[in-house]
Regions:
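Solvent-exposed serine/threonine-rich low-complexity stretches and specific carbohydrate-binding patches
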Residues: 108-116
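Positively charged n-region of N-terminal signal peptides that target proteins for export
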Residues: 1-4
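Short amphipathic, basic-aromatic surface patches that mediate peripheral association
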Residues: 56, 69-88
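Short acidic/polar inter-strand loop motif in beta-rich domains
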Residues: 141-152
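Bacterial N-terminal signal peptides
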Residues: 8-16
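A short tyrosine-centered beta-strand micro-motif
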Residues: 132-139
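Exposed aromatic-hydrophobic patches
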Residues: 121-128
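Short, compositionally biased P/S/T/A/G/V-rich stretches that sit at domain boundaries
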Residues: 23-63
Length: 182
């Protein structure tokens, strides 16, 4: 029994050491745009970017190679009629984005993928993008588009008896000065 506890203690110490090393070798997130955190519909959202990352399954993700950065939207639910937990991540969203330069010309567009990292679930993607100043607009579509259902009966139903929103919610971050810091 004593050996078990010694081994357990050693394993715990190794885990803590590995975590500390991972923290030291970490990376920096850069805030995207001048708006910072925004209230969008029933959610609080913020955007960051950092170096491109490997993701799995790789056939569903934009590859690290050929990408200049990873963009990420972190979001949590506020009080809402859909019964998403307050301060929890909102699943089943489809989030499209359009990136424009300072002259309003579209330079890149795509979709954010739902994913998880060491800091939790989010929507993001690797993208190619030249250094410069940009505006990014997100178009957040209802979870119903991905087959997410709501109970609407009197006994078990959510507050939102009419279902989800029908037009995409939008959020824009301006004055984003993208500089490759890595």
């Amino acid at each position: 029994m004593k050996k078990f506890f010694v081994l357990l203690l050693a394993a715990m110490m190794l885990s803590v050491s590995a975590f500390a090393l991972a923290e030291e070798a970490g990376f920096d997130e850069y805030e995207l745009g001048v708006e910072g955190e925004q209230e969008v519909g029933f959610m609080t959202m913020s955007m960051v970017y950092f170096q491109p990352v490997d993701m799995a399954p790789s056939d569903l993700a934009a590859p690290k190679e050929g990408s200049d950065l990873h963009i990420e939207v972190d979001l949590t639910a506020n009080e809402n009629p859909y019964s998403f937990p307050v301060d929890g991540w909102v699943p089943y969203l489809s989030i499209d984005y359009v990136i424009k330069d300072t002259e309003g010309k579209e330079v890149y567009s795509g979709s954010m993928m739902p994913m998880a990292a060491s800091d939790g679930p989010h929507y993001g993607n690797n993208i190619p993008l030249a250094e410069g100043e940009y505006t990014i607009t997100l178009y957040i579509k209802s979870p119903a588009e991905n087959g997410y259902l709501l109970h609407v009966d009197a006994e078990t139903g959510v507050e939102a008896r009419d279902g989800f929103w029908t037009e995409p919610l939008t959020a824009t971050w301006t004055g984003w000065k993208f500089v490759k810091e890595w």
